[in-house]
Amino acid sequence: MSDDPLQTPRARQGRAPDVFRPGGWVPMRCHRDDEPVDFVIVGTGAGGGTLACKLAEYGFSVVALDAGPYFRPLEDFASDEAEQTKLYWTDDRLVDGANPLQLGSNNSGKAVGGSTVHFAMVSLRFRPEWFKSRTLLGYGADWPLDWREMWTYYTEVEQALKISGPITYPWGPKRPRYPYRAHPLNAAARVLARGCEALGISWTETPLATLSAPRGLAHPCVYRGFCVAGCSTNAKQSALVTWIPRALAAGAEIRDLAMAGRIEVDSDGLVSGVHYHREGGWHFQRARNVVVAGYAIETPRLLLSSATDRYRDGLANSSGLVGKNLMTQSNQAVWGVMDDEIRSYKGPPSLAITEHWNYQDWDKDFFGGYAYMSQGPLPQLWANTQAQARGLWGAPLVGEMTSYNHVAGLKIVGEMLPQERNRVTLADEVDQYGLRIPRVTYSWCDNDKRLIDHALGFMHRALQAAGAKDIWVQEDDTCHLNGTARMGDDPRTSVVDADCRSWDIPNLWICDGSVFPTVGGVNPSLTIQAIACRTADRIRAVARRGELTRRRGAQTKVATHAT
């Protein structure tokens, strides 16, 4: 049998790949399809992988499905940008709107571990006021969560991932020291530092989910620079090498190359399992609860694709909001040429950061905020950027690439506002499984444009103050995907409650970036994992009361077990 992870499932017959030992295996509990498990989880990234771990450790029986392959980082990942495109979700999707999104490498992964397998490891907490941005800051929507409670879950995730970060963090409430020391700054990070200091604002080392010291069988970062193309040393603390091994050890089953197609609903209106495609055919895994954690495009796609006579608009969609309020984050950049060699690709791509404009609410003409970080693009990505953003080709492109080692850049992660017109719907076209593909509609609002203009102007000044020449701006880029199944405290204006539980179907849960009411000006992965940890705790509490599949306001209780 072929061991090509793109063609043949690896997690099967009672074993799964050992991500820490080449060619090694670890035991894995397996369930029959007709054996109802406590939870089927669709997706194994920051939301699903974390939740699978926590629920299994709490004693629930868990089967986690992922459409992507089960990679062995030590063997499958190479210092080859073209080869590593296998990490990205590149299935057909339609895009439209005034600002159609470029989907793939910058915002969605397809692998056990989800997008964390190729993420840039930036691990930041939300500003506390963002959880009540409508009430406190006058825009967006309030979260049904308290920042103080989230602070405890942030700490749990930072410890679980051994985040490497500064001794003190300049913004927000006091927090514990990061578990591991910060990574040393490369030359690109020092350019950011010089620019910030020249303009009188604070900066610091970026908190990163990559090891600065050994951890068990995982080696510290060797600064090879291919972080977003897959870490071949296991220094990157993705879900694949953190939560998933813990989930397996606790008794969870992982099924790779398992594409979920439809959630089944029984005669009582409860979900009863998931239809999925694996090894050439369709299967049905029975479950007492279903969690959708496919990220902000695949999650609404699955919910909408599971419409029934009872739920004609799709599952969990009595509010009509499934698929709506899609939010990306602005990811524009400013680039310049320095006299000294920078070699910005040496080390993780974002070693220094400022959150100044996330925490300052005056002297700006937009709502929300943004962080900006140093950048370290790899050669192929840099050539593609030159061709796409500046139209360079042939001799001009070759000439530009000769200055590659002298280039420094600053790039934002900026907050884009929720808008119902930005949405995921189902197209008429179908994919290789016969499933309708998603149509993704996206347009910037005026506030988004003002934020981008402000950020580009400020970063231009910062780069100029740091000594850059030949400065140019990259005006059209986005990152991350959130929204489309927002949480809230009112079933008329949200899809799930604060516990990520569907208002409509009590044994259907959503646990990923889809539940974000707003997106903030920081990378979302730490918040997604914190929400997953909280959701696991809430599920355990509900189970202990015997209310795991009880309809809201009903008297009957269907209990399941938990330690």
PLM feature segments, named:
Residues E253, N289-A408, I412-G414, A543-T563:
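Mid-to-C-terminal "cap/lid" subdomains and adjacent gly/pro-rich loops that border
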Residues T518-D537:
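A conserved FAD-binding loop/helix module that cradles the flavin
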Residues D3-P17, T135-A260, H480:
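Conserved redox-cofactor binding core of oxidoreductases
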Residues A120-L124, A189, W203, T210, ...:
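Flavin (FAD/FMN)-binding glycine-rich loop and adjacent Rossmann-like elements that form
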Residues E57, S61, G68-A78, T233, ...:
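Glycine-rich loop(s) and the adjacent beta-strand/alpha-helix scaffold that form part
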